[in-house]
C-alpha cells in the first residue's frame, strides 16, 4: 500500500478475458480479474465499480484522490452499453470517466508506422483499422487555402454521395456537426503522429476515403452457420468495420473456412481486404496496400503470414504483412496509460490544473461530455 495519497489517474481495461486495473504511471496493471467465471461478453457495471473501489482503497487508502478514470474497452460493445457503464461509474465514483478508443491509437503505438491497415483478430471479434496520417489533411487545408470547415463540408458531401449510391442513410446535419468537432479535436490533439515523408494534395473524394473511418461506423453482427466457421472462430460472431466497406466483404470473413480454421489466411481475410480495396481510389489503394499489420492469436501460428502473403500476391496485391511489435495482452492498457502520461501536463502542487489538463481528443471522449448533454459520435 502506498504511504502517500497521490493524485492519480486510474486506468481500467476490459477485454474478452478479464478486467485489468492500475495507475496510469505504471508500466503494467496491478490487478487482474478473470471474467471467465461470468460466462458473458459484457461485464455488469456493479462488478467494474466494485473492483475500482477495492483497488483504490487498497492502493491509496482513499477514493478522494482519484482525479480521473480512463476506461479502456478492448471489446465489442454497443454505444448504449458504453454510455451506461460511464454513467454508472460516474454516479458511483463521482470523478470524470474517460472512454478510450483503444484500437486506432493502440495500432499506431504498436507499429510506429503510417499508411497501414490493422487487422485485430480476437476471440470474439475482428476489427479493421485504417491508420490516419493527420499531416496530409493539415497540409491539404493549408495548400488549398480552404478553412477546415470547408474541407469537412466537402468530405461530408462525398459521404452523402457515397451513401446515396449504396442506398444508405444520408449523413444528418447533427452528425456532421459531431464530425466537424471531432476533426477539430484531431488536429489539435497532442497524440503523436509520424510525419509524412511526402506531402501532397488530396482531391475532395480522396480526402473522404482517406479519413472515412472517422465518420460513423457500422457495428455489424455477422451470423453464420457454425459449420461454415473454423473452430478457432466459434465465438467470432461480431465484426466491426467502417460502414463504407461492402457488406459482401463482411460476410466473406467466414466463407471458405475449414474445420481447423486454416483457410482464414488463404480465403477469408483476402476476400475482405479485396472488397475494401475495390472501393478505394487507385491512389489511396496504392498507399493503403503497403502494409497489413496483424494482432491476435491466430496470426502467431507458424507459416500464417507466408500463406496470407502468397494468397494476396496471387490475387494481384503484393502487400507486406507483419505482426504488431507489441503482441502482449496488455497492448491496449499500455497504449492508454502512455497517452494519458503524454496528455497530462500536470503540476503536483496544483490539483485543479491537473483536473483540466487533458487535451481534447477523439481518442479520449470523456463522460463529462455525456453529462453535459453532448452527443457522442455515431462511430463511438
Swiss-Prot record:
GO CC annotations, alphabetized: cell division site; cytosol; dynactin complex; mitotic spindle pole body; nucleus
SUPFAM superfamilies per record: Actin-like ATPase domain
Cell division is among the record's keywords: no
Subcellular location: Cytoplasm, Cytoskeleton; Nucleus
Keyword hit for S-adenosyl-L-methionine: no
Alphabetically ordered keywords of this record: Cytoplasm, Cytoskeleton, Nucleus
Lineage: superkingdom: Eukaryota
Entries under Pfam families matching the protein: Actin
Gene Ontology biological process terms from the UniProt entry: dynein-driven meiotic oscillatory nuclear movement; microtubule-based movement
InterPro entries referenced in this protein's UniProt entry, alphabetically: Actin, ATPase_NBD
Family membership noted in the UniProt record: Belongs to the actin family. ARP10 subfamily.
Protein name per Swiss-Prot or TrEMBL: Actin-like protein arp10
